[in-house]
Amino acid sequence: LFSLNHCGFKVVKDGDDKNYNVINFEDIGNSNINYTIQRNLVRSQNNQNLVDLNISIETILNKNIKEKNISNRVTKYELIVMSKVKILVIDKNKEYEFTITDKGELKASNKINKLKYDENSILLRLANNISNQIDRKITSILNDI
C-alpha cells in the first residue's frame, strides 16, 4: 500500500480572493462590453502580495441573422462576442495572449424598445461570462508561474 503525500499538485481556488491587481486596463471595441469586463476584473486592493498586471482587451461584437420565417422576416439573431486579451505580468515582464468567445441568441421583435432591451440583457450576460472566463484564465496563468 502506497501513500502519495506532497505530489506537487496545487488546488486551484475558484473563489472571490483574487491574486492579482490590475494596474492598467486598455480597451478597444465595444465600450459597453469592455466596461462590464473592466468593472469585473479591476478591483481596488492594496494588498502587497498581489501580482501587478497590465491588461489590454479588444472586443468584437457580431450580430448575425440566424433564422428567417416564410415571409423572409428575421426571427432570430445570433450575437457573438470575441475578446482578444493580452496580459503583461509586470514583475516577470512576461506577456500572455488568449482569445475568448461567447455567443447568445436574440429573438426578433416588432417593438424596437423590446429588441434593444433584450439585446442589452444578452450582451450583459455575455460580458459577465467572458469576464469570468478571463478571471479564471488569469488565475490559471498566475498559478503556473
Q: Model-predicted segments: where are they?
A:
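Bacterial Sec signal peptide processing site at the extreme N-terminus
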Residues: F2-N24
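Compositionally biased, intrinsically disordered linkers/stalks adjacent to structured regions
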Residues: V11-D14, K18, E119-I145
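Post-signal peptide N-terminal segment of mature Sec-exported envelope proteins
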Residues: D17-I37
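N-terminal secretory signal peptides
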Residues: S31-V51
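Surface-exposed short loop/turn segments
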Residues: R39, N49, L53-L124, N132
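Short helix-to-loop capping/linker segments positioned immediately adjacent to catalytic or ligand/cofactor-binding
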Residues: S44, S71, I141-L142
